[in-house]
């Protein structure tokens, strides 16, 4: 009998990084389709720009670091970073914004720390926050869903808007944001926060066209449900674990329910929190990043719950309408501490 001597690890996971990343990209297709349906071609163009920028930036840095370009690009991590950033920004944002944000995410937030597996913060959310802080007007200029939009740009006008800022007829973002009621539109969360500050009641706000006949805003609830479908696919394929999305969504729902129960005149309802903004995208595609999330099961539950609390606090009392990106980055900071106190006890040893 011949014995083969080998070093650890003695058990192997057949699912490579590239396969997991590819599964996440596939799972994102329903969300991308929904955003394209309700907000136009801009989402697809932003994804293409972000993907090209991510791959080029990654290749340049890898070449400078004298590492294999082909092998690293084939793990699809750069592609996924670009995709997540692209679907997070307004579809008609200027082309240079997605290029700048994606380049910052890849070069500064990922490669500067040593590349995949070394970055402490989610690169896509770093890129998003940099853009949001630097260009708040452009980053909050979402088009109204086609159902309540007075004007919807076609494919060519979308390209012109992204690269020139104007349509063929001379229209600009101000014109395209006008809804059927003749008023400039914003996202449901942004509308809710802005209207409350203006002294409007929740009952009045819910009569706005953006909420007409919808639980959490026209179009946005379907976009979130589409991302939920993709998230369920990831759970089914075991590409992610259930702990983070479940604890995040339950905690966000609990905080929203308690807040709405005690102050229904000033705080948003649970369904608005769960089915608007980037809730489902954050729960299944961003918070579950294996590099920047907690690595223990108890830690994942704590990590997700912490992010849920932070999202509710930022949305309810902060200066930004949607707090997913900030919540993710703040939760990333706590990961080493969470992992330290939730690491499993070594078999045969007592807790020290």
From Swiss-Prot:
Annotated GO biological process: electron transport chain; transmembrane transport
Membrane topology designation: Multi-pass membrane protein
UniProtKB keywords: Cell inner membrane, Cell membrane, Electron transport, Flavoprotein, FMN, Membrane, Phosphoprotein, Translocase, Transmembrane, Transmembrane helix, Transport
Cofactor: FMN
Annotated InterPro entries: NqrB/RnfD, RnfD_bac
EC number: 7.-.-.-
GO annotation, cellular component aspect: plasma membrane
Pfam families: NQR2_RnfD_RnfE
Protein task: Part of a membrane-bound complex that couples electron transfer with translocation of ions across the membrane. Required to maintain the reduced state of SoxR.
Protein name (record): Ion-translocating oxidoreductase complex subunit D
């Amino acid at each position: 009998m011949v014995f083969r001597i080998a070093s650890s690890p003695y058990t192997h996971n057949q699912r490579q990084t590239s396969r997991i990343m590819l599964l996440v990209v596939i799972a994102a297709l329903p969300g991308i389709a929904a955003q394209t349906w309700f907000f136009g071609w801009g989402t697809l163009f932003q994804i293409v720009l972000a993907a090209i920028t991510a791959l080029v930036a990654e290749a340049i840095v890898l070449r400078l670091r004298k590492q294999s370009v082909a092998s690293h690009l084939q793990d699809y991590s750069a592609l996924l970073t670009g995709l997540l950033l692209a679907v997070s920004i307004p579809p008609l944002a200027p082309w240079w914004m997605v290029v700048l944000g994606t380049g910052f995410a890849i070069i500064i937030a990922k490669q500067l720390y040593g590349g995949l597996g070394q970055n402490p913060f989610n690169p896509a959310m770093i890129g998003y926050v940099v853009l949001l802080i630097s260009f708040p007007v452009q980053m909050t200029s979402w088009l109204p869903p086609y159902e309540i939009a007075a004007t919807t740009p076609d494919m060519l006008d979308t390209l012109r808007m992204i690269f020139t800022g104007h349509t063929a007829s001379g229209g600009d973002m101000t014109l395209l944001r006008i809804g059927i009621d003749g008023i400039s539109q914003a996202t449901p969360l942004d509308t809710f926060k802005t209207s409350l500050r203006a002294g409007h009641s929740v009952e009045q706000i819910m009569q706005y066209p953006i909420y007409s006949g919808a639980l959490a805003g026209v179009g946005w609830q379907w976009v979130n449900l589409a991302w939920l479908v993709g998230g369920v696919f990831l759970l089914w394929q075991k590409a992610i674990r259930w702990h983070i999305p479940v604890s995040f969504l339950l905690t966000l729902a609990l905080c929203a329910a308690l807040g709405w129960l005690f102050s229904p005149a000033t705080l948003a309802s649970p369904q608005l929190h769960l089915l608007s903004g980037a809730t489902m995208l954050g729960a299944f595609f961003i918070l579950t990043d294996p590099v920047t999330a907690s690595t223990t099961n108890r830690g994942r539950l704590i990590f997700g719950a912490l992010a849920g609390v932070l999202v509710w606090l930022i949305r309810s009392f902060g200066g930004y309408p949607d707090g997913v990106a900030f919540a993710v980055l703040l939760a990333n900071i706590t990961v080493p501490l969470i992992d330290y106190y939730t690491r499993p006890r070594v078999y045969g040893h007592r807790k020290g």
